[in-house]
Design a protein with these regions (language model features):
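The feature encodes the CheY-like receiver
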Residues: 14, 56-57, 88, 106
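Conserved Asp/Asn-Gly motif in the active-site loop of CheY-like receiver
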Residues: 31-35, 92
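Active-site beta3 strand of CheY-like receiver
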Residues: 45-50
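Receiver (REC) domain active-site loop signature in two-component systems and cognate sites
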Residues: 55, 95
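Two-component/phosphorelay signaling modules centered on CheY-like receiver
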Residues: 11-29
Length: 110
């Protein structure tokens, strides 16, 4: 079983993306912001993180920094893909330089 942490503050995104992934056989846990996510990421092993960037409390960039600086080697090395409405090329470059594995711009299709 592949475990995915999906982090987004938009309920519609959480519902539609998690449903699509679960239909394909993935186990998905959802979090509404980075603050919630870091607690979950520190207590359970995930194979992949899908993070929005623009969120309240702790945004995706800050969450990525915390994950990449974690003392937990598995967490620190977890692949992370940004799913974001930030569509400027510079945003993508910054995200990848910060340590994101990939960058997908919203809206996206299955």
């Amino acid at each position: 079983m592949t475990y995915i942490a999906l982090v987004d503050d938009e309920p519609n995104i959480l519902t539609s993306v998690s449903l699509a992934l679960e239909t394909e056989g993935f186990q998905v846990d959802t979090f509404n912001n980075g603050e919630e996510a870091i607690k979950g990421l520190e207590t359970k092993k995930y194979d992949l993180g899908l993070f929005d960037i623009k969120m309240p409390k702790m945004d995706g960039n800050e969450l990525l920094k915390k994950v990449r600086s974690s003392t937990n080697v598995e967490l620190r090395n977890m692949p992370i893909i940004f799913l974001t409405s930030k569509d400027q090329e510079q945003d993508e470059i910054i995200g990848l330089r910060m340590g994101a594995s990939d960058y997908i711009k919203k809206p996206f299709s299955q």
